[in-house]
From Swiss-Prot:
Belongs to the CitD family. Covalent carrier of the coenzyme of citrate lyase. Keywords: Cytoplasm, Phosphoprotein. This is Citrate lyase acyl carrier protein. It holds the Pfam family ACP.
Length: 95
């Protein structure tokens, strides 16, 4: 999947996460979280795993975490990535 435009998913409410995805020449992940010292590596690993499953190798991803659970983070990354592409989504692969 190729990222072709800027897209956002999520909110800045407590227990949620806002994920911003935009075109970039390589994979760049920025994590802003109050719990980054404890969970920063896990947050980055989850983002990388979701992007790999979607076949994304070049994008800038900015994560503004407010204490979201892992499943919420996965859903927000998927939603932002799908909004940021013009490609037809293969729903069987996504689910």
């Amino acid at each position: 999947m190729k990222i072709t435009k800027v897209a956002v998913a999520g909110t800045l409410e407590s227990s949620d996460v806002q994920v911003r995805v935009q075109p970039f020449d390589s994979l760049d992940i920025e994590i802003n979280s109050s719990v980054a010292k404890q969970f920063g590596e896990q947050i980055e690993a989850t983002v990388r795993e979701v992007l790999a499953k979607l076949g994304i190798t070049a994008a800038q991803v900015i994560v503004e975490d407010k204490g979201a659970l892992d499943c919420v983070l996965q859903a927000r990354v998927k939603a932002a990535a799908m909004r940021a592409t013009d490609e037809t989504i293969n729903w069987e692969a996504v689910l």
